[in-house]
Amino acid sequence: KFHGAVVDHCGHEHTRVFAEIADLGKLLAQMDDIVGTTAPARVALVYDWENRWALEDAQGLCNVNKKYVETVMDHYSALWRRGVSMDIVDQASDFAGHDVLIAPFSYMLRGDFALRVDEFVQAGGTFVATYGTGYVDDSDLCFLGGFPGPLKKTLGLWAEEIDVLMPGMENHAQLDGARYALTDYAELVHPEGAKVLAAYEEDFYAGMPALT
């Protein structure tokens, strides 16, 4: 019985809440020019169910939780906190109208996704990939010739192997004067045209590229 209301138990409009709601109505009336308009997202973030299923079924990497969803959400959250709007797409979606395509942990490359990614990059788009990209095709068969399969040329690198970091384990890398902790996975890659931006600091792959 004591919940708030625009018109409270007093029964009249001479209250703070009523005045604020009235002011809000006046403000909304001034926004007719933007009603119905949209701001198209320039960034597309890939969340792909078939890739998720393939990862969850893979008898390798971490058998408890491979953290595909968490990896996608980490990318989403980082952009959302900076006010960047995104379209959530899957690998079969049309992403040609975007400037940036982010495809975290794309273990499975379905259909012509890799081809369309390459065309997207050739047309000036920016493609962001992570560890664990391009290991199997849409029949869940490993790509021959090295990972990330058909994206090797596009990304300008060859992934030799991937190391799983157990909970609590970290490696580190420095970028622009800041030192970052690396968790979950560490992929050993060899640049084949890609520019190395940061390198691992520890373990047997110290000095190898961590970010290109």
Give, region by region, the residue ranges found by the protein language model.
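Carbohydrate-binding surfaces of carbohydrate-active enzymes
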Residues: 1-212
